[in-house]
Amino acid sequence: MSASAAVSSTCAAASSTTSRRSSSSPASRVQATPRRSLPSRLVASRTSPRSPVVPPVYATASPGGAGGTTAAAARKKLLIFDAEEYLAESLAKYTARLSGEAVAERGAFTVALSGGSLIKALRKLTESPYLEAVEWSKWHVFWVDERVVPKDHADSNYKLAMDGLLSKVPIPASQIYAINDTLSAEGAADEYETCLKQLVNDGVVAISEVTGFPKLDLMLLGMGPDGHVASLFPGHPVVNENLKWVSYIKDSPKPPPERITFTFPLVNSSAHIALVVTGAGKAGAVHKAFSDKQSSSDLLPVEMVSQQEGVLTWFTDKPAVSMLSSI
């Protein structure tokens, strides 16, 4: 049996397990537990035990100069790294810190993954000191979007995450919520939303008091050169979905065509959002995302990522921000 198969769990199966567990216990069963201290080198230093890590450039930028004029721009933190290795180390530290804070507060850490190069950027979590320090048993893992293909298919975000991250860390199988790939795109999206609702009822997933949508602890997003995030593509009607938590598309401009995706109200209700964007091919979309000249009629999906609470943190490299004149 492959590593992926050994830890496989559909959202429906995992939800059922959670439901049975909670039938004799209140939702408050997910409670804060004593926080295991992270090594001091993890929280107080920018130096990896293996190699020096250069601090990133911190900026809040717009093409016309540092600093945006809107409230949304003020909630963007732009981190720029000289090398991908430094970005990966910083992203691991950021994720580990948020995990520790969530576990200390609620006894669980809910995180949503994307596909693409994001998983490679998370690889440091599988190494010391993060592998030992993070309370993996408290993690609950979701997918921001997924292709409706078998779990062992080359296009599966589940397979990508399993191969690069999840098979290398001790997260309980019942807390890894894959889609049911035997269903249609619509059926898989509906079932995934039902799963989320069950986990909200069980007290595993919080609800935003501001939006009424699920409030995951961390939403980890990538971005395509066209400015798409999740499976929310420019000009597609699902971009404007504001009632459903999880939706679907059958006509993705990138293969495979059938996918499920979190909607913007769910994405933007997260406690924390990280956008991991690298490469010169994405510089145009980054430039537009930080532009003060925006109208609602031509927004790229990445421009619609706007947290209701907290700060949106961009993890970038210099090629990705090369069109920002203030950098």
Curated annotation (Swiss-Prot):
Pathway given in the UniProt record: Carbohydrate degradation; pentose phosphate pathway; D-ribulose 5-phosphate from D-glucose 6-phosphate (oxidative stage): step 2/3
> Which keywords annotate this record?
Chloroplast, Hydrolase, Plastid, Transit peptide
Q: What is the residue range of the signal peptide feature?
A: none
Compartments, as annotated in UniProt: Plastid, Chloroplast
Q: Does the keyword Magnesium apply?
A: no
Under which EC number(s) is this enzyme classified?
3.1.1.31
Q: What does this protein do?
A: Hydrolysis of 6-phosphogluconolactone to 6-phosphogluconate.
* Family to which this protein belongs: Belongs to the glucosamine/galactosamine-6-phosphate isomerase family. 6-phosphogluconolactonase subfamily.
What protein am I looking at?
Probable 6-phosphogluconolactonase 3, chloroplastic
Please give the organism.
Oryza sativa subsp. japonica
